[in-house]
Swiss-Prot record:
InterPro entries: Cyt_b/b6_C, Cyt_b/b6_C_sf, Cyt_b/b6_N, Cytb/b6-like_sf, Cytochrome_b, Cytochrome_b_C_euk/bac, Cytochrome_b_N_euk/bac, Di-haem_cyt_TM. Heme b b566 binds at residues 97, 196. Keywords: Electron transport, Heme, Iron, Membrane, Metal-binding, Mitochondrion, Mitochondrion inner membrane, Respiratory chain, Transmembrane, Transmembrane helix, Transport, Ubiquinone. The lineage of its organism: Eukaryota, Metazoa, Chordata, Craniata, Vertebrata. Heme 1 (or BL or b562) is low-potential and absorbs at about 562 nm, and heme 2 (or BH or b566) is high-potential and absorbs at about 566 nm. The cytochrome bc1 complex contains 11 subunits: 3 respiratory subunits (MT-CYB, CYC1 and UQCRFS1), 2 core proteins (UQCRC1 and UQCRC2) and 6 low-molecular weight proteins (UQCRH/QCR6, UQCRB/QCR7, UQCRQ/QCR8, UQCR10/QCR9, UQCR11/QCR10 and a cleavage product of UQCRFS1). This cytochrome bc1 complex then forms a dimer. GO terms for biological process: mitochondrial electron transport, ubiquinol to cytochrome c. Heme b b562 binds at residues 83, 182. The keyword S-adenosyl-L-methionine does not apply. The gene is MT-CYB. It is found in: Mitochondrion inner membrane. This is Cytochrome b. GO terms for molecular function: metal ion binding; ubiquinol-cytochrome-c reductase activity. It is a multi-pass membrane protein.
Amino acid sequence: MTNIRKTHPLMKIVNNAFIDLPTPSNISSWWNFGSLLGLCLITQILTGLFLAMHYTPDTTTAFSSITHICRDVNYGWVIRYLHANGASMFFICLYAHVGRGLYYGSYTFQETWNIGVVLLFTVMATAFVGYVLPWGQMSFWGATVITNLMSAIPYIGTTLVEWVWGGFSVDKATLTRFFAFHFILPFIILALAMVHLLFLHETGSNNPMGIPSDMDKIPFHPYYTIKDILGALLLISALLTLTLFAPDLLGDPDNYTPANPLSTPAHIKPEWYFLFAYAILRSIPNKLGGVLALLLSILILMLIPMLHTSKQRSMMFRPFSQFLFWTLVADLLTLTWIGGQPVEHPYVTLGQLASILYFLLILVLMPLTSLIENKLLKW
């Protein structure tokens, strides 16, 4: 008798995606982040659902409802901090996942890569609207500053901003719609993630050497299920440690002050995972230029498959490209640090230099280095 998992219409999909999936035998722990992102998403949806049961999306009660969740709801504080720090874990996994794709040339699976970039944008949008919901000072001013960037769009800018706000400033209408967006977007992310997997399973996984592995495949289960479980345990341990020992480590103290349109915080800055993009935005003195640079800093990922000039797929055997890759990582860490600093000397200049280097590395230096490496190998 044929196994039910191979015949049942629903079980067959699960079987082909997670059990009998032929997988390269040599993929490293860098390939764990896909499953970890799935785990993060499920955690966020579940904790978010329980938070939504107690939250009220109204300017007069939003802040109080968060306080109520933390003080009066059974283990409400755990759920709230798991959700807040879960977002940080989500972005750590996201950036590691994208970095892995860049290093090992996974971007040559163009459909998978482009859906991945769309997913990155959607997760960033979800995190942004979610940060507004507690209605603290940083929530309010963050929403005001970032939505105001749309006013840089010529001709329709101001109208567009007021349309997004639902009025003449960030107010009740804005909070209500942001809550609606924050609730619906994770389910859109879930659907996109399925499309991402669909495209991935059309080609099969890449591997660290970047060479075809059809002659050396192993079943996903048990080899990679057990490996994913180890990764999941490490992620859960890190999340619980952060949540239970230092829940406010990555947050902003200003968000414990209720939103006040009449007093601006000294330093308006987003959560840590947006600081690199914020630094790029601030490093350009022109408003429209800054907005374009901000968008391009992420959209540039879409160009990467077209900028691949090497005859090899992976960077595993390309030391010069490796050096530039780690320079890019260091540059992004520098931008993250600068994004959290006040707008004054020397941070402004450093931010401008780091922003120029970011685009220079991706658009010019890395493709040129790949060509030089081809020449060195007489290819």
